[in-house]
């Protein structure tokens, strides 16, 4: 009985949130840090942290459907940082396998999302990197769904360094010298060589689990992003929590440094 009452109240509250968002500004690019999977498992009395990651992976599909409903154009999912790659293999490899499974689910026929894996994929186990590339390649050309970047082996500082290297390599391959490169180098060169082909700046970054730091996520793209911290662990993240984040964004005055 109590569960039914709670569900009814949640449904009413969601309708209210949807009404409040009507005609309000919405982010076009959301970056979300899927944090708290291991702590969720521990809180739930589950000894195996992999079950927390699996629960978090299942939540991804729900989240993307909410983004479709809210007409969000672009989402970046922060699933594995480059710092995480230093974890022991017995912890890391199962997590990477779960991420690959999630990406393969997103790529399954019938789903609308074009998916790209962004990050230092060359640092991943070769088989896992191949699975990610194969799955994401199958989604290219899709239209109608939210564009999804899956950040795996991702670090914001590494992305900027790699972008500069890529820009320098391109310049050199065209016969340019280093002095010319230094003289003509601009911020646009970095933006052009970031991991994601979409090249859109982030409007809103959401981090679950109550942690209040960005940990290098979308370091270049988040210069003017609004940030929303949510206490809920990622596997328990609800559409209500998502709509609250959108409402928080809609009520802010974005100044873009002015």
From Swiss-Prot:
Co-factor binding comment: Binds 2 magnesium ions per subunit.
Any one of the GO CC terms: plasma membrane
EC number per UniProt: 2.5.1.-
Pfam families tied to this protein: Prenyltransf
Known cofactor(s): Mg(2+)
Function description: Catalyzes the condensation of isopentenyl diphosphate (IPP) with allylic pyrophosphates generating different type of terpenoids.
Assembly mode: Homodimer.
Protein name: Isoprenyl transferase 2
Species in which this protein is naturally found: Streptomyces coelicolor (strain ATCC BAA-471 / A3(2) / M145)
């Amino acid at each position: 009985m109590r569960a039914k009452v709670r569900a009814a109240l949640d449904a009413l509250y969601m309708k209210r949130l949807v009404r409040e968002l009507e005609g309000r500004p919405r982010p076009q690019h959301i970056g979300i840090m899927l944090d708290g999977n291991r702590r969720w498992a521990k809180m739930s009395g589950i000894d195996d942290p992999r079950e927390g990651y699996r629960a978090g992976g299942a939540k991804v599909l729900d989240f993307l459907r909410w983004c479709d409903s809210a007409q969000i154009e672009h989402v970046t999912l922060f699933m594995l940082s480059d710092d995480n790659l230093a974890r022991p293999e017995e912890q890391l490899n199962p997590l990477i396998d779960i991420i690959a499974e999630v990406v393969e689910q997103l790529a399954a026929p019938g789903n609308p999302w074009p998916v790209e894996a962004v990050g230092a994929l060359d640092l991943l186990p070769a088989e896992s990197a191949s699975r990610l590339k194969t799955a994401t390649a199958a989604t290219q050309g899709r239209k109608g769904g939210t564009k999804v970047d899956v950040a795996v082996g991702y670090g914001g500082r590494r992305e900027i360094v790699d972008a500069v290297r890529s820009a320098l390599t391109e310049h050199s391959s065209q016969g340019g010298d280093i002095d010319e490169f230094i003289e003509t180098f601009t911020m646009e060169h970095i933006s052009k060589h970031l991991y994601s082909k979409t090249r859109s700046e982030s409007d809103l970054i959401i981090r679950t689990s109550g942690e209040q730091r960005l940990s290098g996520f979308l370091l270049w793209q988040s210069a003017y992003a609004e940030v929303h911290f949510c206490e809920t662990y990622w596997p328990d993240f609800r559409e209500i929590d998502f709509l609250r984040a959108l409402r928080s964004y809609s009520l802010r005055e974005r100044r873009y440094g002015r």
